[in-house]
């Protein structure tokens, strides 16, 4: 099951050329970029591991692409994403995020249903990948 988080997630994987164009857009808007990775694909896992330091005041998209390449090389079977942060007063938020690397095999999620009082159903998601210990999931 393909993980769909962030921009472009329903499209085919971005090529390096397409990623470079998105990075050029991020840099042209004066946004700060950072690269993050994880092997826990749960949709509510919003705390991915930060790769290096955030790239503030970067004037060239190739610096961000270098960090992406380094992360991909070190973590080939992890999800890797780029975030763009706008520090403009009043916004101060992540304004763009997209996945740039994913594992070759994405096992998907188990939907667990639980019956509660009053015929209420509660649902939870469990990633098949997390059945293995961290670092050995893919």
From Swiss-Prot:
Check the record and name the SMART domains matching this protein.
RuBisCO_small
Alphabetized SUPFAM superfamilies for the sequence: RuBisCO, small subunit
Q: Which UniProt keywords apply?
A: Calvin cycle, Carbon dioxide fixation, Chloroplast, Photorespiration, Photosynthesis, Plastid
Subcellular location, record wording:
Plastid, Chloroplast
One of the entry's Gene Ontology molecular-function terms is: ribulose-bisphosphate carboxylase activity
Question: Where mainly found?
Answer: plastid
CDD domains with a match to the protein in the record: RuBisCO_small
Which Pfam families does the entry link to?
A: RuBisCO_small
Q: Span of the secretion signal? A: none
**A single cellular component GO annotation:** chloroplast
InterPro entries xrefs: RuBisCO_ssu (IPR024681), RuBisCO_ssu_dom (IPR000894), RuBisCO_ssu_sf (IPR036385)
GO biological-process terms attached to the record: reductive pentose-phosphate cycle
Q: Which domain of life is it from?
A: Eukaryota
Q: Does the keyword Chloroplast apply?
A: yes
Q: Which family does it belong to?
A: Belongs to the RuBisCO small chain family.
Q: Do you know which HAMAP family this protein is assigned to?
A: RuBisCO_S_bact
The miscellaneous remark of the record is: In this alga, in contrast to plants, the small subunit is encoded in the chloroplast.
Q: How does it assemble?
A: Heterohexadecamer of 8 large and 8 small subunits.
Q: What does this protein do?
A: RuBisCO catalyzes two reactions: the carboxylation of D-ribulose 1,5-bisphosphate, the primary event in carbon dioxide fixation, as well as the oxidative fragmentation of the pentose substrate in the photorespiration process. Both reactions occur simultaneously and in competition at the same active site. Although the small subunit is not catalytic it is essential for maximal activity.
Q: What is this protein called?
A: Ribulose bisphosphate carboxylase small subunit
- Originating species: Pyropia katadae (Red alga)
């Amino acid at each position: 099951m393909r993980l769909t988080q962030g921009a472009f997630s329903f499209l085919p994987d971005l090529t390096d050329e397409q990623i470079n164009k998105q990075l050029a857009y991020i840099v042209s808007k004066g946004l700060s970029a950072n690269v993050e990775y994880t092997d826990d694909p749960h949709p509510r896992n919003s705390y991915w591991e930060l790769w290096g330091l955030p790239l503030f005041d970067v004037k060239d998209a190739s610096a961000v692409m270098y960090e992406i390449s380094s992360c991909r090389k070190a973590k080939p079977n992890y999800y890797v994403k780029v975030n763009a942060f706008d520090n403009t007063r009043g916004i101060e938020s992540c304004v763009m995020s997209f996945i740039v690397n994913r594992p070759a095999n994405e096992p998907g999620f188990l939907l667990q249903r639980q019956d509660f009082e009053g015929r209420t159903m509660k649902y939870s998601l469990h990633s098949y990948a997390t059945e293995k210990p961290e670092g050995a999931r893919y």
